């Protein structure tokens, strides 16, 4: 018998196939069961999902497209929702294995593509109390967030300029003066 079961089908399909957590737990009570899905818990939980829907819901296209600065949504090529969900699943399973080693108990764990995509834009999320805060925004050309944190086209190619500390700003100013 398996110690861990992981799948990414919709949970109602797992129930129909008899491979849902409750059915398998009846066979192996200490089973670790990881269900990965497209959407967060709630009204969309049972809907099919994919990398791009997760990116849209998390705001990746908005942020990557510099829409706050008048840009347009940008299609995400990273597939971070899919790969990130795999990483989240691996972490959840490792935590469950640790719990099982300490307690002898199996458990149900779950992750979602949209959760992985939220990690991709975690720099723009609100505080836990729901209040907002000033945050860097990608410009509409998707080249940077500020004059000293941007990509510039030069006669020799592209330059990535990142000047993050005040003393380096002063040093750059001295060199350019």
Please provide the spans of the model-predicted regions:
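N-terminal Rossmann-like NAD(P) cofactor-binding subdomain of oxidoreductases
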Residues: 5-63
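Acidic, glycine-rich segments within the central catalytic cores of soluble metabolic enzymes
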Residues: 42, 51-53, 57-177
